C-alpha cells in the first residue's frame, strides 16, 4: 500500500497496480490451498482430470487457472474452466459444475480452487458511499480447494460429503440488489439494504424444492453450510426458517474468524464442520446428521442450493 497510495484513496485510478498484484497472488495462494487438498486426498496429481478455478480478483489471459497448472505441475491435458467475477454465490456454482463433470466423465477427478483477495476492492472510506464501507468491514482474503469425483476407490479415497443435488435460482425482482463494476479505481460494488429481506423471503422456496423430494420438512434436522454474507442475512434466515441458533455455528465461526471470503467461504465452513464433528465424536461429518444444505448467495440476486449427504466417521 505504501508503494501504491492510490489504493488507499477513495476512487483514485489504481487498476493497473491492483491487477498486477492479483495476477501474481491469486494463483500463488490458490496453489497453497490446492497442495493441502491434494495431500489429504492422497492420490498422485496425474489423476486430476479437470480444474475449476474461481476468483473475483484479477483478470488475465491465458488466466490464473493456467498459472495454477504451471505452479502445481499438473498434466497439460487437464481440462480447465475459469470462472471470473461470479461473487459470493459461486461456492455453490463450482460444486454444481464439478458434480456434472464427475458424473459424466469416467474416472474424472475435478480439482476446485477458489482464491479471493480483497486488494481488488480495497480503498479508503467516504461518507457518501456506505456500501463500500460495509464491504471493507465484511470482506476478507481466503483460498480453498477440494477434489470431487464419482465412485471413490475403496480404502484409497475417503469421501467427506456426497453431493446429492444442485440448483440455481435468479430471484425475481431482485435486479440491482448486489452487483459490481470493474473500473479504473478497481472493483466497485453495491449492496442494497434489502438483501437480507430478499434472501430470507426466498429461502423457504429453495429449501422446499431441494428437500420435498426427500420427505424432509424439518430444517433443524439437517446440517447447514450457508454462505455468511453478513450477520443480518444469517439472522433473518434463522428467523424465517425457525432455526435453532446452533445450526449456524460453523457459519458464524467462519464469518467471525475469517470474514466473508466470497466463493471460498462455504469450503471453510465445510472443513470446520467435518473437523469439529470428528473432534466431538459424532457419527457423521455433518454434525452427526445425515442430510444437509449448502447455500450460496450473491449478485443477481442469485441463490445456489446444494443438497449434501454426510459420511460416517
From Swiss-Prot:
Alphabetized GO MF terms: trihydroxystilbene synthase activity
SUPFAM superfamilies xrefs: Thiolase-like
Domain of life: Eukaryota
GO-annotated biological processes: polyketide biosynthetic process
Catalytic activity of the protein: 4-coumaroyl-CoA + 3 malonyl-CoA + 3 H(+) = trans-resveratrol + 4 CO2 + 4 CoA
Location of this chain's protein in the cell: Cytoplasm
Alphabetical list of InterPro entries matching this protein: Chalcone/stilbene_synt_C, Chalcone/stilbene_synt_N, Chalcone/stilbene_synthase_AS, Polyketide_synthase_type-III, Thiolase-like
Catalytic residue positions: 88
GO CC aspect terms: cytoplasm
Enzyme Commission code(s) on record: 2.3.1.95
Pathway field: Phytoalexin biosynthesis; 3,4',5-trihydroxystilbene biosynthesis; 3,4',5-trihydroxystilbene from trans-4-coumarate: step 2/2
Keywords: Acyltransferase, Cytoplasm, Transferase
First-level EC class: transferase
Residues that coordinate or bind substrate: 191, 229-231
Description of how the protein assembles with itself and partners: Homodimer.
Family: Belongs to the thiolase-like superfamily. Chalcone/stilbene synthases family.
Record-given protein name: Putative stilbene synthase 2
Amino acid at each position: 500500500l505504501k508503494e501504491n497510495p492510490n489504493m488507499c484513496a477513495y476512487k483514485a485510478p489504481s487498476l493497473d497496480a491492483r491487477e498486477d498484484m492479483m495476477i501474481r497472488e491469486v494463483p500463488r495462494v490458490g496453489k497453497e490451498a490446492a497442495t493441502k487438498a491434494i495431500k489429504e486426498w492422497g492420490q498422485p496429481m496425474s489423476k486430476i482430470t479437470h480444474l475449476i478455478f474461481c476468483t473475483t480478483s484479477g483478470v488475465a489471459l491465458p488466466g490464473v487457472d493456467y498459472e495454477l497448472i504451471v505452479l502445481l505441475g499438473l498434466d497439460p491435458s487437464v481440462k480447465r474452466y475459469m470462472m471470473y467475477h461470479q461473487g459470493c454465490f459461486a461456492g455453490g456454482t463450482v460444486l454444481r459444475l464439478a458434480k456434472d463433470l464427475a458424473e459424466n466423465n469416467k474416472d474424472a477427478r475435478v480439482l476446485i480452487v477458489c482464491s479471493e483477495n480483497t486488494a481488488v476492492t480495497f480503498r479508503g472510506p467516504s461518507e457518501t458511499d456506505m456500501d463500500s464501507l460495509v464491504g471493507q468491514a465484511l470482506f476478507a482474503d481466503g483460498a480453498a480447494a477440494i477434489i470431487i469425483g464419482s465412485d471413490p476407490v475403496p480404502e484409497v479415497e475417503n469421501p467427506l460429503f456426497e453431493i446429492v443435488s444442485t440448483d440455481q435460482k435468479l430471484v425475481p425482482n431482485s435486479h440491482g440488489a448486489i452487483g459490481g463494476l470493474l473500473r479504473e479505481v478497481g472493483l466497485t460494488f453495491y449492496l442494497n439494504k434489502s438483501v437480507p429481506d430478499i434472501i430470507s423471503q426466498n429461502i423457504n422456496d429453495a429449501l422446499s424444492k431441494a428437500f420435498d423430494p426427500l420427505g424432509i420438512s424439518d430444517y433443524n434436522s439437517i446440517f447447514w453450510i450457508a454462505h455468511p454474507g453478513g450477520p443480518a442475512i444469517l439472522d433473518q434466515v434463522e428467523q424465517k426458517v425457525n432455526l435453532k441458533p446452533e445450526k449456524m455455528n460453523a457459519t458464524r465461526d467462519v464469518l467471525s474468524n475469517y470474514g466473508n471470503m466470497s466463493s471460498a467461504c462455504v469450503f471453510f465452513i465445510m472443513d470446520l464442520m467435518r473437523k469439529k464433528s470428528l473432534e466431538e465424536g459424532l457419527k457423521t461429518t455433518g454434525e452427526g446428521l445425515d442430510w444437509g444444505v449448502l447455500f450460496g448467495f450473491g449478485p443477481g440476486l442469485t441463490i445456489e442450493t446444494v443438497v449434501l449427504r454426510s459420511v460416517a466417521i
